[in-house]
C-alpha cells in the first residue's frame, strides 16, 4: 500500500440505500446557469430555479457527496431528492431557511415562500 492509495471493494457502492426519494421538475428561469451542490437544502436554492419548494422542503439532491447538478437557463429537468439526514438541522445557508427542518410546519420563515413568481410552483 502507498500513502493516499485507496483500495475499493468489488461492485458498485449504493447511493443512499433505503432512503425515500422524491422526484421534482425544475426549470431554470434565470439568465445564467445555476449549480447546486450535493448537500445543499434544495428548498433554499436560487430563486431563479422554479419548482415545488414545499415538496423539496427538508431534502437534498440524490447525487454522490461532493458533486453538483447544473441547471442551464431555460432548461427543464427532473431531479431526485432524498431527505436531509442526521440531526435534520440546516445551519447558515440562507437565514430564512436555517434551523430545524422538522416541527415548524415544513415551511421556512421567508415572507415570499410559496408565492408564484418566487421560484415556486405546485
From Swiss-Prot:
Keyword match Methyltransferase: no
Compartments (UniProt record): Cytoplasm
Catalytic activity annotation: urea + 2 H2O + H(+) = hydrogencarbonate + 2 NH4(+)
GO molecular function: urease activity
GO BP term, pick one: urea catabolic process
HAMAP family linked to this entry: Urease_beta
EC class name: hydrolase
Name of this chain's protein: Urease subunit beta
Database matches in InterPro entries: Urease_beta-like (IPR002019), Urease_betasu_sf (IPR036461), Urease_subunit (IPR050069)
Taxonomic path: Bacteria, Bacillati, Actinomycetota, Actinomycetes, Pseudonocardiales
Subunit annotation: Heterotrimer of UreA (gamma), UreB (beta) and UreC (alpha) subunits. Three heterotrimers associate to form the active enzyme.
Region of interest called Disordered, as start-end residue ranges on this chain: 92-122
Entry's family note: Belongs to the urease beta subunit family.
Predominant subcellular localization, coarse grouping: cytoplasm
Record-listed E.C. numbers: 3.5.1.5
Recorded metabolic or biological pathway in which this protein acts: Nitrogen metabolism; urea degradation; CO(2) and NH(3) from urea (urease route): step 1/1
GO CC, one annotated term: urease complex
Coiled coil residues, start to end: none
Amino acid at each position: 500500500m502507498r500513502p493516499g492509495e485507496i483500495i475499493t471493494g468489488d461492485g458498485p457502492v449504493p447511493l443512499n440505500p433505503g432512503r425515500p426519494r422524491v422526484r421534482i421538475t425544475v426549470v431554470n428561469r434565470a439568465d445564467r446557469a445555476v449549480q447546486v451542490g450535493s448537500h445543499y437544502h434544495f428548498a433554499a436554492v436560487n430563486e431563479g430555479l422554479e419548482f415545488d419548494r414545499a415538496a423539496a422542503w427538508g431534502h437534498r439532491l440524490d447525487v454522490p457527496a461532493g458533486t453538483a447538478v447544473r441547471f442551464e437557463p431555460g432548461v427543464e429537468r427532473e431531479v431526485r431528492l432524498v431527505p436531509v439526514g442526521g440531526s435534520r438541522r440546516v445551519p447558515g445557508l440562507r437565514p430564512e431557511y436555517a434551523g430545524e427542518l422538522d416541527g415548524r410546519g415544513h415551511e421556512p420563515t421567508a415572507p415570499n415562500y410559496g408565492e408564484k413568481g418566487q421560484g415556486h410552483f405546485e
